[in-house]
């Protein structure tokens, strides 16, 4: 029986399914890491092995709590530290921590997760999404290095489905995972146009919604939940400070710095923005990702640095081609400080175009679209426009998508003709390795005619299938190095 650590899958749509499979002996959950807001739900209240990462933010461990890593293991995961560091930079609890202190924090979390894996003899870790944020980005390479199999569930691709893979490196290729289902032919039909209805850009997820009265009324529509959430945030904040004096001093300093950075960001945007662009010249359209986000911090690899991608793009283009860069509508000052704009201004023939300029007009007239892992490339190839990507993404093996490499020629990308039928066939093959169910509440909220019972049955069927597959096909290296 698989001895499993589950991270997430704690929402009401899926947690009862996971709990039931454990209780029936389908697999054994030794550790279940759940969100602090879910800890008192009935499915977790009486269950052993529940871990709340938020409770350990202050890192006040005792000597007997943590085991030391073997030397070979420390050496094996150390090359992954830049990715871990990039992900810790977005953790609010450790925000503005000096680099050297981040290294201490990472070492402590590494020992914590190593102890969980080794003492519980974990042989499988299940992640509900690509491992990101500081904590999961520590656990993932640690598990991989120890020969512990990882199963990653990724809500991506067509709405209402999720993909699965055994490693981040296989995401987009899906070469290592079995086919799960036979999609309906209608699922693989692609409208030959750019525009897509994206749930995360609609309703409560839209950029402007957070500042509206309606948004704030929704926030307090459940007073008990609202108060509990604010209380958790306040208590977590207090963990960061050793006394009231430190709390007041750092809060004042942080507030002042935030104000300055927001103001400076607006100044830089105003200074760089181009409101008039020529859609008839030769150019490549590069829509920026929202940052910080998993899609760049993890799936982007070294191209979490989006300016680096633009610099590489500039180097491969003919000198007279322009690059039109457009900011993400949800972007704030984070990862957009002064030197971001200084670097951008130093790249020849690059225009930072106004957010009001229509995305699809920019896409339609471009030679091709370039992005790290963005939906823009999927929109582009759907409408017949080729795309250049710099990271890993679910559609990366589809016709018309080019992964950046040093010898790639811009003219070859621009001249490639997408066969729409071949594109639909590629989507069909992708869908064979997806599940037509959901496990996230925010997706369910925007679904019409959602059937919770049917969804639960589909989830259970998939987990039974995948657990059986992993038991019948154990990792060759599982546990060997640990022994």
Region roles according to the model:
Residues 7-25, 138-141, 302-317:
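Histidine-anchored nucleotide/phosphate-binding helix
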Residues 29-36, 153, 322-328, 332:
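Short internal beta-strands
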Residues 112-176:
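Conserved nucleotide-sugar donor-interacting segment of glycosyltransferase catalytic cores
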Residues 178-226, 400-483:
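Leloir-type glycosyltransferase catalytic cores
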């Amino acid at each position: 029986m698989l001895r499993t650590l589950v991270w997430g899958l704690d929402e009401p749509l899926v947690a009862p399914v996971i709990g039931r499979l454990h209780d029936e002996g389908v697999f054994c959950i030794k550790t279940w890491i759940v969100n602090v807001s879910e800890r008192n739900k009935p499915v977790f209240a009486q269950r052993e092995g529940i871990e709340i990462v938020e409770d350990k933010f202050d890192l006040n461990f005792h000597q007997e709590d943590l085991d030391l890593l073997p030397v070979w293991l420390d050496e094996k995961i150390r090359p992954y530290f830049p990715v871990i560091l990039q992900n810790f930079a977005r953790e609010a609890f450790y925000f503005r921590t000096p680099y050297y202190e981040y290294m201490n924090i990472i070492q402590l979390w590494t020992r914590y997760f190593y102890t969980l894996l080794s003492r519980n003899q974990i042989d499988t870790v299940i992640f509900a999404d690509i491992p990101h944020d500081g904590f999961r980005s520590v656990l993932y390479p640690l598990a991989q290095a120890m020969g512990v199999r990882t199963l990653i569930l990724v809500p991506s691709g067509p709405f209402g489905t999720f993909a699965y893979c055994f490693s981040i490196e296989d995401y987009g290729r899906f070469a290592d995972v079995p086919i799960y289902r036979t999609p309906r032919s209608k699922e693989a039909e692609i409208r030959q146009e750019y525009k897509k209805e994206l749930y995360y850009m609609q309703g409560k997820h839209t950029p402007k919604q957070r500042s509206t009265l309606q948004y704030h009324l929704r926030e307090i529509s459940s007073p008990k939940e609202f108060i509990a959430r604010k209380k958790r945030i306040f208590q977590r904040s207090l963990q960061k400070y050793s006394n009231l004096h430190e709390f007041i001093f750092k809060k004042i300093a942080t507030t002042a710095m935030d104000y300055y950075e927001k103001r400076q960001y607006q100044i830089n945007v105003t200074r760089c923005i181009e409101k008039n662009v020529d859609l008839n010249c030769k150019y490549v359209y590069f829509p920026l990702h929202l940052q910080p986000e998993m899609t760049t911090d993890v799936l982007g690899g070294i191209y979490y640095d989006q300016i680096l991608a633009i610099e590489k793009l500039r180097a491969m283009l003919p000198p007279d081609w322009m690059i039109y860069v457009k900011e993400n509508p949800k972007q704030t000052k984070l990862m957009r400080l002064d030197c971001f704009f200084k670097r951008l201004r130093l790249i020849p023939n690059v225009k930072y175009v106004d957010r009001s300029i229509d995305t699809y007009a920019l896409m339609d007239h471009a030679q091709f679209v370039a992005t790290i892992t963005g939906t823009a490339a999927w929109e582009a190839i759907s409408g017949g426009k080729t795309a250049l990507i710099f990271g890993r993404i679910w559609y990366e093996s589809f016709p018309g998508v080019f992964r950046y490499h040093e010898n790639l020629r811009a003219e070859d990308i621009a001249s490639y003709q997408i066969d729409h039928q071949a594109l639909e066939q590629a989507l069909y093959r992708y869908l064979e390795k997806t599940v037509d169910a959901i496990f996230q509440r925010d997706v369910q909220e925007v679904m019409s005619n959602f059937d919770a019972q049917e969804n639960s049955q589909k989830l259970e069927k998939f987990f039974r299938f995948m657990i059986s597959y992993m038991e019948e096909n154990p990792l060759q290296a599982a546990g060997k190095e640990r022994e």
